[in-house]
């Protein structure tokens, strides 16, 4: 029963808003490099009541390869939705919510703006990829898409063990943009200012999934009790030091000494002019001992707690400590993205990069060749190439239906992202199987659940120095028995004088790599050495988005129908 005497006044009338279907399909032709997280779709008009059905087709070409590369790379595609209320703390007040005074909002808000840098943004910047005009300075535009991009990277692409998060402001102030060419560019502070695209992390493997420490937390010690008695026993056998000779720098200097019990003296001795220190007579010393038979022992509960805390820290390292990851790891509960107030994943796909060979059918008088000196390519012309010489081109096409269908209940930004990554191959390390020396280095069922173990630096880069034995990172026990890295040998090695490393994308380090923020980034270098054109972006693509929007709008806006919903 309604508590109001007249229920009519306790309800509000509702109007069913008719919806119309709109074909908002379009293409985006762009260029980019491997390792960059490229925003190739940005729609900031998402409103409550929208339903979006997304299909996508793509054609991606690589700049001409020198040879038909025998390796693996993928184009990864992702779509996310970011509510505006997560990007700007006054979005709800902007829309009319009143939480400061009765009846109506007393403050009029405007969308935070970003001001183009003095000379404008240049090619390859976030602003460029999102469709903001380049090479024009001083104009203003919405800052929310760049906040959305930074939030997506923080929540979905940042390696939380090694990378600092991007700073994201949520206030009302306008900000000045930063260009990709700014020498002081820092992704932490400048991603929201439309500078360079952030880097994606390398695909996880034995090395790239290493942890910086065995557990995420301090080392857990085993409790041994609160106290134990200490006893002292004097030793009556004296020590009669001999005469010591010092160099000239000791002349006239003071030498401190401490005589142990029985003399209990503390003082100093002057050296003489002959630079000698003579005997100081008998010195007696004693022995200190801890009587553990009378020590207070640890309880079973204290020992249990130590093991439980250790297990907790190890799970923190294994699953991650973003709140959604922590809940999944410890409680095995999967929270939806919108519940966790984070960018919501819509859908995506992975497209293998194709490589096609071109067989030469006529001999030529010259051939382009490349070799590496100090890690840099040196190009030269050979006299002749025979028929059957293998060149290459890379053309990747894909059409994906029903990428996602989603209905939205609030205002926000729909953003599509793509990146190219290679599957990493290693050639400079010593596989751990060749370093086993003790029986404990071999697997036994009793050793199955040991803690995270050290991965030595020599496993990824060996140069015969003491640094080979340093710890690179930490990996689950017996990971070497579960994994085998991709390798290259023979003339494929990059350190061979006449190397054929233009045929693969294996890592080639000029110095010892460390598990660090820079190393975990996917970069363009491995692909760069295999392409003939060095001064352009590595990939250029044509992306077609078949975007069907069903929106709470009439099909046409007809002037005069001012009293109709």
What are these regions (language model features)?
Residues 2-565:
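Intrinsically disordered, low-complexity segments
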């Amino acid at each position: 029963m309604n508590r109001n005497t007249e229920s009519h006044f306790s309800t509000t009338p509702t109007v069913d808003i008719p919806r119309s279907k709109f074909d908002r399909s379009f293409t985006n032709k762009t260029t980019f490099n491997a390792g960059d997280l490229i925003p190739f779709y940005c729609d900031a008009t998402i409103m409550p009541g929208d339903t979006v059905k997304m299909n996508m087709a793509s054609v991606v070409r690589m700049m001409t390869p020198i040879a038909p590369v025998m390796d693996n790379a993928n184009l990864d595609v992702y779509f996310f939705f970011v509510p505006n209320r997560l990007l700007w703390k006054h979005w709800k007040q902007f829309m009319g919510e009143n939480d400061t005074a009765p009846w109506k909002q007393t403050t009029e808000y405007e969308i935070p703006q970003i001001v183009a840098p003095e000379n404008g943004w240049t090619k390859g910047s976030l602003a460029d990829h999102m469709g903001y005009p380049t090479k024009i300075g001083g104009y203003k535009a919405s800052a929310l898409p760049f906040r959305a991009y930074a939030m997506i990277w923080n929540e979905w692409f940042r390696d939380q063990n090694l990378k600092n998060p991007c700073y994201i402001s949520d206030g009302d102030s306008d900000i000045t943009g930063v260009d990709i060419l700014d020498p002081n560019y820092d992704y932490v502070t400048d991603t929201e200012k439309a500078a360079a695209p952030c880097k994606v992390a390398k695909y996880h493997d034995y090395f790239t999934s290493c942890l910086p420490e065995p557990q995420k937390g301090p080392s857990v010690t085993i409790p041994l009790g609160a106290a134990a008695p200490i006893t002292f026993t004097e030793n009556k056998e004296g020590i009669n030091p001999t005469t010591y000779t010092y160099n000239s720098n000791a002349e006239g200097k003071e030498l401190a000494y401490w005589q142990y019990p029985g003399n209990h003296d503390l003082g100093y001795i002057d050296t003489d002019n002959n630079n000698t220190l003579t005997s100081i007579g008998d010195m007696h010393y004693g022995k200190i001992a801890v009587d553990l038979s009378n020590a207070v022992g640890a309880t079973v509960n204290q020992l249990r707690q130590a093991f439980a805390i250790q297990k907790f820290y190890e799970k923190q390292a294994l699953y991650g400590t973003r709140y959604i990851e922590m809940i999944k790891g410890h409680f095995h509960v999967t929270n939806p993205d919108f519940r966790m107030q984070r960018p919501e994943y819509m859908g995506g796909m992975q497209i293998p990069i194709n490589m096609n060979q071109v067989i030469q059918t006529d001999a030529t008088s010259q051939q382009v060749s490349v070799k590496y000196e100090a890690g840099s390519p040196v190009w030269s012309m050979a006299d002749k190439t025979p028929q059957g010489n293998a060149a290459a081109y890379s053309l990747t096409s894909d059409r994906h239906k029903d990428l996602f269908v989603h209905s939205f209940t609030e205002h926000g930004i729909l953003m599509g992202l793509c990146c190219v990554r290679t599957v990493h191959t290693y050639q400079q390390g010593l596989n751990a199987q060749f370093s086993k020396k003790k029986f404990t280095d071999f697997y036994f069922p009793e050793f199955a659940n040991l803690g995270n173990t050290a991965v030595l630096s020599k496993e990824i880069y060996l140069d015969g120095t003491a640094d080979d034995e340093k710890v690179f990172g930490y990996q689950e026990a017996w990971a070497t028995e579960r994994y085998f890295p991709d390798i290259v040998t023979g003339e494929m090695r990059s350190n061979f004088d006449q190397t054929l490393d233009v045929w693969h994308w294996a890592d080639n380090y000029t110095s010892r790599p460390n598990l660090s923020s820079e190393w975990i980034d996917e970069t363009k270098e491995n692909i760069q050495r295999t392409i003939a054109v060095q001064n352009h972006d590595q990939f250029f693509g044509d992306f077609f988005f078949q975007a069907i929007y069903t929106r709470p709008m009439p099909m046409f806006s007809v002037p005069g129908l001012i009293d109709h919903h």
